[in-house]
Amino acid sequence: MKITWLGHAAFRVETAKAVILIDPFLNGNPGAKGIDFKEATRGVTHIALTHGHGDHVGDTVAIAREHGATVIANADLASWLGSQGVEKLDPGNTGGTLAHEGFTITFVNALHSSAMLTENGVSQALGNPNGLVFHFEDSPTLYHMGDTDIFSDMAFINELHQPEIGIVPIGDRFTMGGAVAALACQRYFNFNSVLPCHYASFPIIDRTADKFIAGMADHPATKVLADPAGTVHSFQA
């Protein structure tokens, strides 16, 4: 399996049977400078969304139309995407597991919000925010936390799914900051590797992963992969 951070909370996950984009906010993403859009979206089979904010839905509609990708999202967000012309949708909700070729995806809790600003300036709620747990046939289990704060039920996510790779928001203000994110990783999980995200994009959130790296310094069993956007990481089962 290969995982590429595309800036902010966007990731490309490649396995033998699927190419999954998570929260594909590319155009207009300050953290995606230098990312080639065509290369980032090449061969995409699925798009998985954690919630309905514009910096996570991003280019979903355009990518889904161009590639015929299946979009996996909370039921309310999926309904909205359908109204925008997305044809291949697989809706779910918190606690649900969906099966696709080569992997399953489970919707778990996240402490955040989920809405889209409509053309008339009204904020439209788009269901609950989620974290997403991916179980693959031939690769380590991956948990993208979405946008969230720390919460004690992370312990149940670890008990049920035992994720080996964590994608963790660290930018503060709209999610937990680096020190709290490090505490979440150490207290509730046994990750082999973690990829921090939701930083180094907008100027009002943290510009570096320094606080997270410092917080993880006394937990050497977990490898922190805080590399620049565009870096490809490979993982074996």
From Swiss-Prot:
Alphabetical UniProt keywords: Hydrolase
InterPro entries for this protein: Metallo-B-lactamas, RibonucZ/Hydroxyglut_hydro, UPF0173, UPF0173_UPF0282_UlaG_hydrolase
UniProt GO MF annotations: hydrolase activity
Domain of life: Bacteria
SMART domains: Lactamase_B
SUPFAM superfamilies in the cross-refs: Metallo-hydrolase/oxidoreductase
Alphabetized Gene3D superfamilies for the sequence: Ribonuclease Z/Hydroxyacylglutathione hydrolase-like
Family classification: Belongs to the UPF0173 family.
Protein name: UPF0173 metal-dependent hydrolase BOV_A0561
Native species: Brucella ovis (strain ATCC 25840 / 63/290 / NCTC 10512)
